[in-house]
């Protein structure tokens, strides 16, 4: 019996002019998600999704490439203005922000939403940078 051909789900074009860019930058990777005001995901990308492997994922260049990719996807939906929420201690924070600005977005606000413990759990091994 023949298999049914896999359906290709086509992304419908949403006309959303403003949204929120969530930049999550860890020591190992940088993930960028663009959502609408309610938090529904419009587009996402990461350094690993761009083909970087291992320690190359944590570089600022990899974060820049991920930001350019997610910017292109979001602009297909009519996105023009962004609020940026940056989270995490990684090295891709600034370069992802610059790449989003260079892609033609109007950045209305930048917030650092990195969770800071008030002396909670003991952190993992001491980082040697």
Curated annotation (Swiss-Prot):
UniProt record similarity statement: Belongs to the universal ribosomal protein uS11 family.
Family matches, as InterPro entries: Ribosomal_uS11 (IPR001971), Ribosomal_uS11_bac-type (IPR019981), Ribosomal_uS11_CS (IPR018102), Ribosomal_uS11_sf (IPR036967)
Gene Ontology cellular component terms for the protein in this record: ribonucleoprotein complex; ribosome
Subunit: Part of the 30S ribosomal subunit. Interacts with proteins S7 and S18. Binds to IF-3.
Gene3D superfamilies listed in its UniProt record: Ribosomal protein S11 (3.30.420.80)
Function, as annotated: Located on the platform of the 30S subunit, it bridges several disparate RNA helices of the 16S rRNA. Forms part of the Shine-Dalgarno cleft in the 70S ribosome.
Protein's UniProt keywords contain rRNA-binding: yes
Alphabetized GO MF terms: rRNA binding; structural constituent of ribosome
PANTHER family xref list: 40S RIBOSOMAL PROTEIN S14/30S RIBOSOMAL PROTEIN S11 (PTHR11759)
Protein's gene: rpsK
GO BP field: translation
Keywords (A to Z) from UniProt: Ribonucleoprotein, Ribosomal protein, RNA-binding, rRNA-binding
Protein name (Swiss-Prot/TrEMBL): Small ribosomal subunit protein uS11
Domain of life: Bacteria
């Amino acid at each position: 019996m023949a298999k049914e051909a896999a359906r290709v789900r086509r992304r419908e074009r949403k006309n959303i002019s403003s949204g929120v860019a969530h930049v999550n930058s860890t020591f190992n990777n940088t993930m960028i998600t663009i959502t609408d005001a309610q938090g529904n995901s419009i587009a996402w990308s990461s350094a690993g999704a761009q083909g970087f492997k291992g320690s190359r994922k944590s570089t600022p260049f990899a974060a820049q490439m991920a930001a350019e990719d997610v910017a292109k996807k979001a602009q297909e939906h009519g996105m023009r203005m962004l609020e940026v929420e940056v989270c995490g201690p990684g090295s891709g924070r600034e370069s992802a922000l610059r790449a989003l600005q260079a892609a033609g977005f109007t950045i209305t606000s930048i917030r650092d939403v990195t969770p800071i413990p008030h002396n909670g759990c003991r952190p993992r091994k001491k980082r040697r940078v």
